[in-house]
Amino acid sequence: MIRSVLVLMCSLTFIGNLTRGQSVDMGHNGTGSCLDSQVQPDYFESVHTTWPMPIDTSKAEGVIYPNGKSYSNITLTYTGLYPKANDLGKQYLFSDGHSAPGRLNNLFVSNYSSQVESFDDGFVVRIGAAANKTGTTVISQSTFKPIKKIYPAFLLGHSVGNYTPSNRTGRYLNHTLVILPDGCGTILHAFYCVLHPRTQQNCAGETNFKSLSLWDTPASDCVSGSYNQEATLGAFKVYFDLINCTFRYNYTITEDENAEWFGITQDTQGVHLYSSRKENVFRNNMFHFATLPVYQKILYYTVIPRSIRSPFNDRKAWAAFYIYKLHPLTYLLNFDVEGYITKAVDCGYDDLAQLQCSYESFEVETGVYSVSSFEASPRGEFIEQATTQECDFTPMLTGTPPPIYNFKRLVFTNCNYNLTKLLSLFQVSEFSCHQVSPSSLATGCYSSLTVDYFAYSTDMSSYLQPGSAGAIVQFNYKQDFSNPTCRVLATVPQNLTTITKPSNYAYLTECYKTSAYGKNYLYNAPGAYTPCLSLASRGFSTKYQSHSDGELTTTGYIYPVTGNLQMAFIISVQYGTDTNSVCPMQALRNDTSIEDKLDVCVEYSLHGITGRGVFHNCTSVGLRNQRFVYDTFDNLVGYHSDNGNYYCVRPCVSVPVSVIYDKASNSHATLFGSVACSHVTTMMSQFSRMTKTNLLARTTPGPLQTTVGCAMGFINSSMVVDECQLPLGQSLCAIPPTTSSRVRRATSGASDVFQIATLNFTSPLTLAPINSTGFVVAVPTNFTFGVTQEFIETTIQKITVDCKQYVCNGFKKCEDLLKEYGQFCSKINQALHGANLRQDESIANLFSSIKTQNTQPLQAGLNGDFNLTMLQIPQVTTGERKYRSTIEDLLFNKVTIADPGYMQGYDECMQQGPQSARDLICAQYVAGYKVLPPLYDPYMEAAYTSSLLGSIAGASWTAGLSSFAAIPFAQSIFYRLNGVGITQQVLSENQKIIANKFNQALGAMQTGFTTTNLAFNKVQDAVNANAMALSKLAAELSNTFGAISSSISDILARLDTVEQEAQIDRLINGRLTSLNAFVAQQLVRTEAAARSAQLAQDKVNECVKSQSKRNGFCGTGTHIVSFAINAPNGLYFFHVGYQPTSHVNATAAYGLCNTENPQKCIAPIDGYFVLNQTTSTVADSDQQWYYTGSSFFHPEPITEANSKYVSMDVKFENLTNRLPPPLLSNSTDLDFKEELEEFFKNVSSQGPNFQEISKINTTLLNLNTELMVLSEVVKQLNESYIDLKELGNYTFYQKWPWYIWLGFIAGLVALALCVFFILCCTGCGTSCLGKLKCNRCCDSYDEYEVEKIHVH
């Protein structure tokens, strides 16, 4: 542990505090003329960049150690005066003078003495940084010598002018502080004198004066063991006479060549000096070693040039020194175990530094962090108020003031007042206020101003104070404290002759009403007149004189006015927002225009409405004569200015800033959340210095607009990644620069930047056989395809609330009070950051579970002509149908007609003989009627035509007997008409079936739209929950929590210091409570979203990747397949399944047991044992129990495949006879495996696409219009039940004519002859006429009968 830093350092020792006073002895004055100086700034600037030395905070350079405090082995943030990180400072160089062999010539300096710099908050100096190296001698830049350390000299003062008669700048007027090194760098002078220029040749008061220059001559002044302690001081005295010196201090310095730091600051205690010398240990920490009694504000400083008079052959190079301005900054400091500051971070330098300071850690792990600790600072003022006539205070200044019980009241509106002028006419003895400060009362705007005045002795001032219970407040005047009010007690001076002095002061001692029960005292209401005013107006001439009217009685007391008249003024104001406001007389000022302050944070005072905000031009809304436009939370959002323009007003809030940091490459980038890049530049006052610089200079790639906000330090890319270490949200990922993939900036190529990639999450579609479980008494008998839609919220919007900004809105007074609440804000930030990390973890787990390596689109995985749009109810038929072969289709003509169900039997009958003769024989019976198809082939046409013509032609020859030949024709007509009728009836029944099926589809569509409505409602609620929470949090900003106003600026403007703290503390306490409740709610919602993410993971794994056996888990009904798509804040599922449309109520049993001993029991597998009462009787008890699956009612015998032996259970059904053993059969419950086999074959699907989630902000998601459309669709579907009219089909084949058959047979014969000659005759001999027989090679094979196989 280090000792107190106030202990004087061994290497920098104070050796004298010479006599302080108005005439400190500074020794003899300078004599002779000044040395001539050659001023050549170009020589010094040419080596300006030789040794760039920026502030390196990692080495704690330029850090002033906290005064009076000591820390050990700790890291903390500290606000004080520090240099800015990476500040290059300003470089200064000294040089040897001109010389020739054997003589020393004029001095060689830069123009530093004419450069007057602003002192501001002070500065620090880096001294001897390049000592012991090799450098140029400046005067001869080609000559390089070892570099020696040299100390700077300074002039510091309040006022600066020009030297006369040379008219050169840089002369310090009045008292000037001089810091002067001497004794060849072994002593430091500090004195405070008036510098009077001497008029000798080349001196400051002479015409040829060029530059103030210090010098010493090492050959004579720096002789070993005998250093000249006043060589430089003597040179300074040659230029100035030192007059009226108030002090002179000397400090010795140990001679060395080590680099060191020196600093100067000033406060009300004086000028403070700091040095990094500490017990001969040289570090970058500077410790306070002296305070100089300089109380006049130092505004400027100048570096005094120095030139060393060295011989030509002994020139040296002198180390440059660097001056860095100090600023009020917050640093993160690391103290080692000894107490020294080993490293630091400038919290305002860049976003990474901001991140480190937010977490008070130098080591930050790779991640995405939300930080925002820099608020908008007002950069101007905007004031507008009514300019009308002056408020008339004449009635108060003329006539005789009334007594207290009959006070007079003046109410002012729509005028400008001047309370300062009014009160200056009186001798004020007391000015006390409530809810407003005296200064604010004189400078604020109000909707009305009320003044009550009366004659009143100041000796009785205590009786008017709050809490008094005397006769004054009971029966005369009671001040109203419900509004801001002030009480002024004053004496009327003799020269104010317009006011007439009364002879007596008077007040009431009682006021009461007489009744049978005695006196009923009547007390004054606040700000109201006494009920006995009518009696008191009669006046009082003696003490305790009473007046009564029979009902009321009052008593008065008088005492004479001695000396000057004394009066009381009660001033009350009311705050409002109307244009008839009362404002102070406006002084001439330049802050009445907003045009030059648009889009920046300003303090505003608009007709009594004060605050802080950003103004910008926008489209006018609201009523112009109302001036102000407010939102639902009573926040000012618009203003109609006196210049005719309308301005939108938004608060000076900080933009959510996220820092993306990669530890491996030590790179970082910045993301401005929920803000457009076009708006970022208007908010730059809130950002770190490097961020503002980059935004202006565009030195980094970007800004780049993304769905999550405006990104800096990124370049866009087409990369798609499966793993992401730095998720940005909305499926975006930050890819840090790496050794394998580096992206150089296009501008300089010297820095690595991040890339924005897209996360790729995919999931395969793997389906398993359907198998339902569970027990129900209503078993489905019919199904339809149905789609159930479901939304699951997996994440909520990440929120980072800048606690300090939310509570205090940038007001330092509030922030100082907020520090007394300890680490509350840091805990809030940590809690929100933890919630965000919890979300990242849950989403990462979800995505890691559902992603796959290789996927293919759904359409690419389907074989054949399968069409996804044709997913509908499978067609179920009750019979089998035979089809002709392809050859038959080629050999026969065919026609398609409506088939009532008899066409197949007719066709089979016709094949057994000549068709022309079998037509009537093959007539079919349907419902008792003979029917024939309504078609004739050419043979039947010829036969029936011949029969008809013959009967007609022969009728005249046979006396009508030949008409019997027309009977077949008539019967064929009758039968065919019957067929047409039967066909129409069957078609009508088919139409009913089709209509029923279509109406079932409509019902399924209605159900689908209903679930869509419900799912959309859940999406809307999930997205809007975040906005509602933020809106509620924002609404609390308008809550006063018992304070006089919700605006801190109003509180600061109205009240004095003590009341300000009390009122602001109420706001802090209330807002912290609201913020704590919000954070607690956010944590609960985060945990709920994490649990929902787990549910979504289960849904994807069980529903999307496979088939679920759980009833109702993956939609309604028997699950088939599910699809997942992206949705705001979650996943949207489409569950496809078989949904029952009708059920049968069956008597079921959990199991069956017999009465044998030991008893045997069986239980169903994935189904039930049911009583099939339609096919069984009570007597047939062996056959009345059947098995049916739970997903479809299909009673079947109990087999080993659908049952198993189990132990006895009380719920099992007992049979009185022997339990039949399960049949040895493979029959199982009816499932849909065969129907869906082709659908499930080679099916795969691309998983959820998480790349295009739209940005969700606090704007409420409104799906009401879409939901109304869906409701209207459902309504229209309810009206869509129609009767369909569509016919069935039957294909009828007709043989070709005889001549076609003749040609066909001739062709076959020719083909057979060719085959015979090729295969037989050519293979058995030399020719078909040879001696060898061909029967051996052409022998036929033995015939055998083929066993017939029947296929059912």
From Swiss-Prot:
Biological process annotations from GO: endocytosis involved in viral entry into host cell; fusion of virus membrane with host endosome membrane; fusion of virus membrane with host plasma membrane; receptor-mediated virion attachment to host cell
Alphabetically ordered keywords of this record: Coiled coil, Disulfide bond, Fusion of virus membrane with host endosomal membrane, Fusion of virus membrane with host membrane, Glycoprotein, Host cell membrane, Host membrane, Host-virus interaction, Lipoprotein, Membrane, Palmitate, Signal, Transmembrane, Transmembrane helix, Viral attachment to host cell, Viral envelope protein, Viral penetration into host cytoplasm, Virion, Virulence, Virus entry into host cell
Recorded topology in the membrane: Single-pass type I membrane protein
Coiled coil feature spans: 1020-1064, 1259-1287
GO CC terms in record: host cell endoplasmic reticulum-Golgi intermediate compartment membrane; host cell plasma membrane; membrane; viral envelope; virion membrane
Residues in the Cytoplasmic compartment per record: 1319-1352
Signal sequence bounds: 1-12
Descriptive protein name: Spike glycoprotein
Organism of provenance: Bat coronavirus HKU5 (BtCoV)
